[in-house]
Amino acid sequence: MPIYDRYGRPVLSLRIQLNTTCNFSCFFCHMEGTDVNGEELTPEEIERVVKISHEFGVNKVKITGGEPTLRADIIDIIGRIRKHITGNISMTTNGTMLPKIAKDLKKAGLDRVNISLHSPDDERFHFITGTRMIDRVLEAVRSANDAGLTPVKINFVVLKDLNVNDIPRMLEIAAENNAILQLIEYETDREGESSEEYRRYHISLDPIEAQIRKKAIGVEYNDLHNRPRYLMKNDHGVVKIEFVKPQRNPDFCAHCTRLRITSRGEFKTCLMRSDTNVPFKGVTDENRLRDLFRIAVSLREPYWKPGDEQQTEETYDSAISESK
């Protein structure tokens, strides 16, 4: 039976950050809400916390980083997680290491991947990521399909005046590779909304979604956040598009059923908060670990609440007017 927080939200999945190291330097990366300090969890510690979490009803895991495939023990970690999780195990990756290990990841128990591709244009890709590895990322999409790590999702963070015009080509790439395209809103906490970088690159996805909705031939709904998945036809087939819009979105928070694990061994109750983190690294007693899990769940609270969404338009309008 799942465990519920004070707001009636069940905890059904874990989002496990394996590291903070990455071979990209995307300027908008939130690093799963952590800094680069701290010793990483061992495979044994990860398995222990997954085992305990499963006892409380967790049966789905997302692996993240940093870049999780930079860990030499990634195959072992996936295998240990699979011992206890019969549901979906997925991983978010930039894909640069994936062609070499995709089949081994699948064999170990990984079900599918999200691959980050924030522009199909080499120069814009370089500006965003600081690398020239776009060809390796595209190869990773193909390798993931070949290995059966499907459905592949392509993560595309939409950035004002930078990659918005790349969306039509991204739709083609997704259709060519039978992948789902996730258009993701640039996300930050309340304090970050006033930063020059956020105001320069954040754009509301509502107008883009309205255009896609008009052209869609069908719609499905995502289980996690009850968000729509649009089906569109193009010259390369049918493509599915999801919009991830967490910024000042109380509905997004209301449907959150995920508990996060930081790479340094903490239960993290919310991406946008660190003051409610519950450390567990070094705890080997399973009863104590169960207590810490319960404490973390009791501290879960929606970051965005009803009333916050009104400020979305105010923030957006202010940013637009000041950028003119």
Swiss-Prot record:
List positions binding GTP: 15, 62, 92, 153, 258-260
Give the residues the record marks as binding [4Fe-4S] cluster 1: 22, 26, 29
Q: Which GO terms describe its biological process?
A: Mo-molybdopterin cofactor biosynthetic process
- Give the InterPro entries listed for this entry: Aldolase_TIM, Elp3/MiaA/NifB-like_rSAM, MoaA_arc, MoaA_NifB_PqqE_Fe-S-bd_CS, MoaA_twitch, MoCo_biosynth_MoaA/MoaC, rSAM
Q: Which reaction does this enzyme catalyse, per its entry?
A: GTP + AH2 + S-adenosyl-L-methionine = (8S)-3',8-cyclo-7,8-dihydroguanosine 5'-triphosphate + 5'-deoxyadenosine + L-methionine + A + H(+)
Q: Which GO terms describe its molecular function?
A: 4 iron, 4 sulfur cluster binding; cyclic pyranopterin monophosphate synthase activity; GTP 3',8'-cyclase activity; GTP binding; metal ion binding; S-adenosyl-L-methionine binding
Q: What class of enzyme is it?
A: lyase
Function description: Catalyzes the cyclization of GTP to (8S)-3',8-cyclo-7,8-dihydroguanosine 5'-triphosphate.
What name appears for this protein in its UniProt entry? Probable GTP 3',8-cyclase
Organism per entry: Thermoplasma acidophilum (strain ATCC 25905 / DSM 1728 / JCM 9062 / NBRC 15155 / AMRC-C165)
